[in-house]
């Protein structure tokens, strides 16, 4: 009887230990996802000139607590290595837009050789099925047809922050970006939700069309965005300093070039159809065009990598 009791007790202890181990692993997994993940964006400016080439390392704090779907989407793309070797393709008055283009040869290609990335190939399989783990939009209300587009956690899409204190633009802030307009898909709708526990709802496609593009805010005057989601900010003083130094480097480069040629501009407008016509099977005609073109930096801003430093 004593031996039987010992066997039973041993089995019970083993079972309890196994349960404790499984619980610990589960808690560890959950603990890996923080409210404020961090990414590191590493870029170079004007790397064709070895005398002035410099690397800028920018650490970003992302706000998963406020924008869960947006943060999950960009973290997954970063983990896929999607952004490695991409460029800033549109340098606007208050932001630099990236995440959608590269060059055939990052060292020698000029502005005319800008080319789009194949987002569809990176996020769907050979059968056309979406391969992303984080899905926030679907073609149907039953959620049987996942899409590789991001649900718009924006006020224009009816999304609101619980306490009303979402992020707004300030120097260095990172936000979602898309060029599509209502005219490009006037009646198209999809189904989406802002987080796993919320109900799916029918929404306009043009507010839920983001794929991989993002912007870094460069303007001096900030403000809120209605169509785009500001989901992160520079994480520390060192990154703020480096971002400021990058802006200074661009300004100094432009001034130096203008001393040699007073007609010099930092960007060149590209309107070539192969560049500004963006393939989109959910748009009315299967694509949309950026009519005003892109203001492409003539001295490349290359994103050499985006890595997740903290989940």
Where in this protein do the model-derived segments appear?
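Gram-positive cell-envelope targeting signals
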Residues: 1-40
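Cross-family detector of peptidyl-prolyl cis-trans isomerase
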Residues: 31-311
């Amino acid at each position: 009887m004593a031996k039987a009791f010992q066997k039973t007790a041993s089995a019970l202890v083993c079972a309890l230990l196994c349960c404790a181990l499984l619980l610990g692993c589960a808690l560890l997994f959950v603990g890996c996802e923080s409210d404020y993940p961090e990414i590191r964006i590493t870029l170079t400016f004007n790397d064709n000139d070895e005398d002035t080439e410099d690397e800028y390392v920018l650490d970003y704090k992302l706000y998963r607590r406020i924008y869960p779907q947006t943060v999950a989407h960009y973290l997954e793309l970063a983990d896929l290595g999607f952004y490695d070797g991409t460029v800033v393709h549109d340098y606007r008055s208050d932001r630099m837009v990236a995440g959608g283009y590269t060059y055939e040869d990052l060292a020698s290609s000029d502005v005319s050789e800008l080319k789009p990335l194949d987002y569809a190939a990176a996020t769907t399989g050979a059968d056309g099925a979406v391969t992303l783990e984080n899905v926030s939009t679907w073609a149907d209300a039953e959620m049987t047809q996942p899409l590789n587009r991001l649900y718009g956690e924006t006020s224009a899409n009816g999304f609101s922050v619980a306490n009303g204190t979402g992020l707004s633009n300030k120097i260095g802030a990172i936000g979602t970006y898309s060029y599509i307009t209502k005219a490009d898909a006037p009646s198209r709708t999809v189904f989406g939700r802002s987080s796993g526990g919320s109900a799916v709802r029918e929404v306009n496609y043009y507010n839920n069309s983001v794929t991989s593009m993002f912007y870094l805010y460069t303007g001096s005057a900030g403000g809120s965005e209605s169509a785009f989601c500001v989901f992160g900010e520079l994480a520390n003083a060192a990154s703020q300093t480096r971002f400021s130094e990058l802006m200074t480097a661009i300004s100094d480069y432009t001034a130096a070039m203008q001393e040699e040629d007073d007609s010099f501009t930092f960007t060149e407008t590209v309107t070539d159809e192969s560049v500004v016509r963006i393939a989109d099977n959910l748009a009315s005609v299967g694509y949309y065009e950026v009519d005003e073109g892109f203001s492409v930096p003539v001295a490349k801003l290359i994103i050499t990598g985006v890595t997740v430093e903290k989940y």
